[in-house]
Design a protein with these regions (language model features):
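Short S/T/G/P-rich N-terminal loop/turn motif that feeds into the first structured element of a domain
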Residues: 1-33, 40, 50, 85-90
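Amphipathic, hydrophobic secondary-structure cores in small proteins
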Residues: 41-52, 63
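Acidic/polar N-terminal loop/beta-strand segments that form early-domain functional surfaces
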Residues: 9, 44, 56
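Short, flexible active-site loop motifs that bind/organize anionic cofactors or intermediates
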Residues: 11, 53, 67
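An amphipathic, aromatic/His-enriched active-site/gating alpha helix that lines ligand/cofactor pockets
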Residues: 56-83
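Generic, well-ordered alpha-helical segments
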Residues: 20, 47, 55-58
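A short linear hydrophobic-aromatic micro-motif
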Residues: 37-43, 76
Length: 90
């Protein structure tokens, strides 16, 4: 199943408290459970003003629907084509 990188513009994201991040995570997880196993949240990276999320989903529309239901921004959704790391250089 394809993986997607979602860029979410959230001003002040890096200053969200642990409790706020927990609440956002709980809401996201509840929606994912309701949507079924075809869409999965892998992880997220929080920066100053953006959150970058990795999802496994059948298509970008499923990612958009998750964002719509949660009221989360999804400013850019890109399908991940491949992953490289330092071992790729060997």
């Amino acid at each position: 199943m394809p993986k997607y990188l979602i860029e979410r513009e959230i001003p002040g994201a890096g200053n969200l408290s642990a409790a706020e991040l927990q609440a956002i995570s709980q809401k996201s997880s509840q929606i994912l459970t309701a949507m079924g196993p075809q869409i999965q949240w892998v992880n997220s990276y929080v920066t100053d003003d953006k959150v970058y999320c990795i999802y496994i989903a059948p298509n970008a529309d499923a990612v958009r629907e998750h964002a719509r239901q949660g009221g989360f921004p999804a400013n850019r959704i890109s399908q991940i084509k491949t992953m490289i790391d330092p071992s790729t250089a060997e």
